[in-house]
């Protein structure tokens, strides 16, 4: 059950970021009777639990799957039936640096799930009531948090949108940042809110280059799959950490598509390389690992500057009741999808119980 609102708790709240943490936080606050506005700079919700749409089908180029360990996460998922399905963990292999299978399957038999028909189906479903109520501002980047010009006890947000348009949203009792740690820290410092940002200084998050490949010509009656018979693998190749056959996921189209995620170390080393160079190097590594030498009809890379938490904050969230500023995200406690959910939930509970 959502917490019973405290008389002193903030009633009009801004949540910056519409990833899993932001949506979990916002929906919990709405359920407790708060007015919430979510600001998201992208044109869709989901954050790293998002999908890329192409002419050859979708690619889950961020989070690849999620697991469920916290009962509260399981309860929240139950409110969005049909938006996720199990993805067989027995298909996941562990490869040596040359692409040979070193372990037949992951040691853990923990169920793996994916959004259906896209990875962002779960956050999209959770956000639906907020969107329908006009509580989500997509394509809106918050550039500064400052005290409300008309009421110094409240906050206002300076924002930018399409075509360099600017707008001020005001009257917030609390502002909650559900952003990657580096982005949250930068926004707080740009807003002269260094006290909260300093608490994030020790957090470390690694980047990740993601490669998307499509082989539509592989769809032949006598050809079941192209390349390896496994559908997903953890790789020890120096460039590649993960590979997944997108068409093996439930609800996806049959076009042969692969998502490849570079290793944290390689991604960091080549973080500022141009996309063409990264694509060529990762494609070469993909061929070495899978044995697939065919030329893809589609190839594209995407750079996640903040992908996997290396050193978490060590607590579920940050909340300053006195100022009305808070922050949440997977970086607080880990790097899993569920970690983002738990962090957003815990921040909402703390705000509601103020």
Language-model segments: residues:
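N-terminal FAD cofactor-binding segment of flavoenzymes
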Residues: 51-93
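Flavin (FAD/FMN) cofactor-binding core of flavoprotein oxidoreductases
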Residues: 280-323
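Glycine-rich FAD pyrophosphate-binding loop
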Residues: 30-54
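A conserved short coil-to-beta-strand element within the FAD-binding core of flavoproteins
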Residues: 138-155
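N-terminal Rossmann-like FAD-binding beta1-loop-alpha1 element of flavoenzymes
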Residues: 11-38, 348, 352
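Active-site substrate-recognition segment that forms the wall
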Residues: 212-270, 277, 281-290
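Central helical "cap/lid" subdomain
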Residues: 46, 54-59, 168-228, 292-294
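Short beta-strand to alpha-helix junction loop
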Residues: 65-69, 101-127, 272-278
């Amino acid at each position: 059950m959502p917490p019973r609102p405290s008389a002193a708790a903030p009633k009009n709240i801004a949540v910056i970021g519409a990833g899993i943490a932001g949506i979990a936080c916002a929906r919990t606050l709405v359920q407790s009777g708060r007015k919430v506005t979510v600001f998201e700079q992208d044109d869709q919700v989901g954050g790293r639990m998002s999908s890329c749409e192409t002419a050859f089908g979708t690619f889950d180029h961020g989070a690849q799957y999620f697991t469920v360990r916290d009962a509260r996460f399981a309860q929240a998922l139950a409110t969005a039936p049909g938006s996720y399905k199990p993805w067989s963990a027995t298909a996941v292999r562990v490869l040596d640096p040359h692409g040979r299978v070193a372990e037949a399957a992951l040691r853990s038999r923990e169920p793996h799930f994916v959004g259906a028909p896209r990875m962002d189906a779960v956050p999209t479903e959770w956000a639906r009531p907020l969107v329908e109520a006009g509580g989500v501002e997509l394509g809106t980047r918050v550039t500064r948090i400052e005290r409300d010009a008309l009421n110094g006890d409240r906050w206002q947000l300076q924002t930018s949108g399409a075509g360099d348009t600017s707008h001020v949203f005001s009257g917030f009792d609390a502002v909650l940042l559900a952003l990657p740690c580096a982005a949250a820290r930068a926004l707080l410092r740009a807003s002269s809110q260094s006290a909260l940002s300093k608490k994030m200084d020790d957090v470390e998050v690694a980047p990740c280059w993601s490669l998307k490949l499509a082989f539509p010509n592989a769809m032949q009656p006598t050809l079941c799959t192209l390349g390896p018979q496994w559908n997903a693998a953890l790789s020890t190749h120096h460039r590649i950490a993960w590979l997944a056959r997108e068409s093996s996921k439930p609800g996806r189209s049959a076009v042969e598509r692969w998502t490849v995620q570079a290793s944290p170390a390689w991604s960091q080393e080549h973080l500022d390389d141009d996309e063409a160079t990264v694509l060529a190097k990762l494609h070469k590594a993909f061929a070495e690992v899978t044995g697939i030498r065919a030329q893809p009809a589609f190839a594209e890379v995407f750079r996640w500057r903040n992908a996997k938490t290396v050193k978490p904050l060590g607590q579920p969230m940050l909340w300053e009741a006195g100022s009305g500023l808070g922050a949440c995200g997977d970086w607080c406690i880990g790097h899993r999808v569920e970690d983002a959910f738990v962090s957003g939930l815990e921040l909402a509970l703390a705000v509601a119980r103020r």
